[in-house]
Design a protein with these regions (language model features):
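Cytosolic regulatory regions of ion transport systems
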Residues: 1-174
Length: 174
């Protein structure tokens, strides 16, 4: 059912962002072929949560609070990075971000948005060279492009790329 739903949605519009839950990884390849934007592995997530809680006391409560939309004082979120910081360092952005109240910068989410759009733009950019070896190298990078790739606490010299968002922990008002 899940695979058919994603196929139907993507047939209507490739730009619609789709997220699907999988209980069994054996269907993963079908969802990837259907251009599913995000695949959530419920069992894998549960196993990791259980393993993490055995090592770090209270981890399940922390994660539940961060992911819950109606409980807790804070939540994980992403916000757009102003254009003037694209091409600058994470350290520069982190210093400027310190001025925001009620938010803590914890990382960067690279290549955000529709995987179809991200890959088309990356492909166009990769083809802007007349050097064949550079072109091949660029195309290999596009093939390995990971959409919505989180980088938690990157080094200060990390260069902020286009289509990235800041991962933040924000205090809820109210």
């Amino acid at each position: 059912k899940t695979v058919m739903t994603v196929l139907t949605i993507k047939a209507m519009s490739k730009d619609v962002y789709t997220a699907a839950e999988l209980l069994d990884k054996k269907y993963e390849s079908y969802l990837k072929q259907a251009d599913c934007d995000e695949i959530i592995y419920s069992r894998d997530f549960s196993r990791r949560m259980l393993a993490s809680t055995t090592v770090t006391s209270g981890m399940s409560h922390i994660m539940f609070s961060l992911l819950s939309s109606d409980e807790g004082d804070s939540r994980l979120s992403t916000v757009g990075i102003p254009e003037e910081f694209q091409g600058k360092t994470y350290g520069d952005y982190k210093d400027a971000f310190g001025a925001f109240k009620n938010s803590l910068l914890i990382g960067i989410l690279e290549n955000t948005g529709s995987p179809h759009r991200v890959k088309i733009e990356a492909l166009r950019e990769a083809q802007k060279t007349s050097d064949v070896s550079m072109l091949v190298n660029n195309l290999q990078k596009v093939k390995g492009l990971e959409v919505n790739r989180p980088l938690l606490v990157p080094p200060d010299d990390y260069i902020l790329k286009r289509h990235s968002r800041a991962i933040i922990l924000e205090r809820r008002e109210g």
